[in-house]
Amino acid sequence: MSGVVRSSPGSSQPPPPPPHHPPSSPVPVTSTPVIPPIRRHLAFASTKPPFHPSDDYHRFNPSSLSNNNDRSFVHGCGVVDREEDAVVVRSPSRKRKATMDMVVAPSNNGFTSSGFTNIPSSPCQTPRKGGRVNIKSKAKGNKSTPQTPISTNAGSPITLTPSGSCRYDSSLGLLTKKFVNLIKQAKDGMLDLNKAAETLEVQKRRIYDITNVLEGIDLIEKPFKNRILWKGVDACPGDEDADVSVLQLQAEIENLALEEQALDNQIRQTEERLRDLSENEKNQKWLFVTEEDIKSLPGFQNQTLIAVKAPHGTTLEVPDPDEAADHPQRRYRIILRSTMGPIDVYLVSEFEGKFEDTNGSGAAPPACLPIASSSGSTGHHDIEALTVDNPETAIVSHDHPHPQPGDTSDLNYLQEQVGGMLKITPSDVENDESDYWLLSNAEISMTDIWKTDSGIDWDYGIADVSTPPPGMGEIAPTAVDSTPR
């Protein structure tokens, strides 16, 4: 269509009807155009909402249409007949009713729905084709705020209440805090679980979950059924001094943390100084300690000190001396094992204490011992000899109730004097053959095992059997086993 005819702002009145002439009389000729009767057509159903009520009809003045006879008017919601005198807008009333019901929907309590309150109702605004989609989008935008029911009482103030509880409100952590606060408010720290469940408005199984955890970490105890007692700070959380004690403990923890940090700094500085000292080639000749340096340490005063030089991974075992049930006397042993290399053992210092015998008299220890005996041992206790049987194992295995200076050859070990310290060297006998009491090798005789000096005369009289030669070593009588194998 070529154009749109607009109505004048003045009042629009219908034109006067044309004069009716009888068919026999001739039609007078006038200067004004003849307006034909209005042809009514059925309007097509429109999918767009109407701009105005369907019962209203707008008609234009003939004067405004005198120069626009061939134009037509198109409206978004109706169909316009191509007339020369008027434009009629029609829209189906059923469509308008359905649309208006959708736009304005009164709620049950007399208020309009919050999702449709912002929809314009002015007839001058044209809704889009996707008007229903816009309504959904606005309703979706308002979904973030909870819709609360509005009271019908107009005089009461409108209050907003949450539609649902938060997840944190029902969490076990928050419930535990509330439960501990109840214990603090309880008298003498005693709380009834039934009353706690009623106060907190939770099930008892939730209370039991909390009490099981607190009882597991030793904060509460159950002296009676369904009653708990606090065992935390000051044994009673209801005291007023509990908060003060907690603050004191926190301050003490901070002070200890500062002291620990200072000690860590000192350790780090000392390690750096030792590293610089050891890595410097000029200081290699000073990298040693003497026996006096070791004995002068405060922790080694009045102690028997045995130094062990062993590779990394060496294990040291000291069995209980009372576990040797097959031996009548207590046995003190030190067992060293290593698979990475040889083990060196030194007797650095020997404690010169008094040893008490069975009669209670004090006597000084022998002048020369294979190794130092345990401090405070009696005459019935064994003085052990530490031997290194092979580069992998060092075992204290020999019993010597009454040691003498000449008995070192009978124990099959060698000792070297190194710079004032006594070094214990490995034995010639292998580890598997060190237990000579149970040795069953037929090639080794008893004479070879108990070898002494070659000048000893074994052919002496029968009467002299009870008196051994003066050069022969003493043998423990309980150690001989004459049972043939």
Swiss-Prot record:
Residues 249-277 are annotated as: Leucine-zipper. Gene3D superfamilies: 6.10.250.540, Winged helix-like DNA-binding domain superfamily/Winged helix DNA-binding domain. GO terms for biological process: positive regulation of DNA-templated transcription; positive regulation of meiotic cell cycle; regulation of transcription by RNA polymerase II. GO terms for cellular component: cytoplasm; nucleus; transcription regulator complex. One of its GO terms (molecular function) is DNA binding. The keyword Nucleus applies. Residues 114-125, 142-159 have a biased composition (Polar residues). SMART domains: E2F_TDP. Residues 245-286 form a coiled coil. It comes from the Eukaryota. Transcription activator that binds DNA cooperatively with DP proteins through the E2 recognition site, 5'-TTTC[CG]CGC-3' found in the promoter region of a number of genes whose products are involved in cell cycle regulation or in DNA replication. The binding of retinoblastoma-related proteins represses transactivation. Regulates gene expression both positively and negatively. Activates the expression of E2FB. Involved in the control of cell-cycle progression from G1 to S phase. Stimulates cell proliferation and delays differentiation. PANTHER family: TRANSCRIPTION FACTOR E2F, TRANSCRIPTION FACTOR E2FA. Heterodimer with DP proteins. Interacts (via dimerization domain) preferentially with DPA, but also with DPB. Interacts with maize retinoblastoma-related protein RBR1. No interaction with E2FD. Belongs to the E2F/DP family. The C-terminal region (366-485) is required for transactivational activity. The N-terminal region (92-128) is important for nuclear localization. This is Transcription factor E2FA. The lineage of its organism: Eukaryota, Viridiplantae, Streptophyta, Embryophyta, Tracheophyta.
